[in-house]
């Protein structure tokens, strides 16, 4: 598993660094052509063009000064996980300039040395609270995400 974990770490670092610098095309190139990126805030994006647009039109439209540090990357060549510490400065109305930090776990399915599916688990409420959103806005977002989780269980 050592060399497979090292290969995965190189791949996910290439993806995360491309995202941090706003290079959507380079991030999307880490995926198979019909790969999926499931973002904890923005939802699911399928295909390289959708992933490129997500990076450029969502991530970098709503935030700046990204930092994404990875640790404990493990892979068997098909399934992979990595812990991360992620931060950014918000551009969203009402939270402009707020630095947001959270940690989480990346869950990755691999195919032919590329990402077939990227997903993540982190505490979205912690991130929203750092942006000083009103409690009602945070509760509304968390209720929506909870309903999505419940629906996915069926």
Q: Can you name each region flagged by the protein language model?
A:
Residues 1-33, 138-154:
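Short, low-complexity N-terminal intrinsically disordered segments enriched in polar/charged residues
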Residues 66-68, 100-106:
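Short, surface-exposed coil-to-beta transition loops
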Residues 103-140:
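Short beta-strand edge/turn micro-motifs at domain boundaries
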Residues 36, 81, 116-117:
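General beta-strand recognition
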Residues 31, 86-88, 122:
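Short beta-strand segments enriched in hydrophobic/aromatic residues
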Residues 61-64, 88-99:
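Short, cysteine-centered beta-strand-loop-beta hairpins and adjacent loop/turn segments enriched
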Residues 5, 24-78:
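A solvent-exposed, acidic/Ser-Thr-rich amphipathic alpha-helical stretch
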Residues 77-88:
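A short hydrophobic beta-strand element
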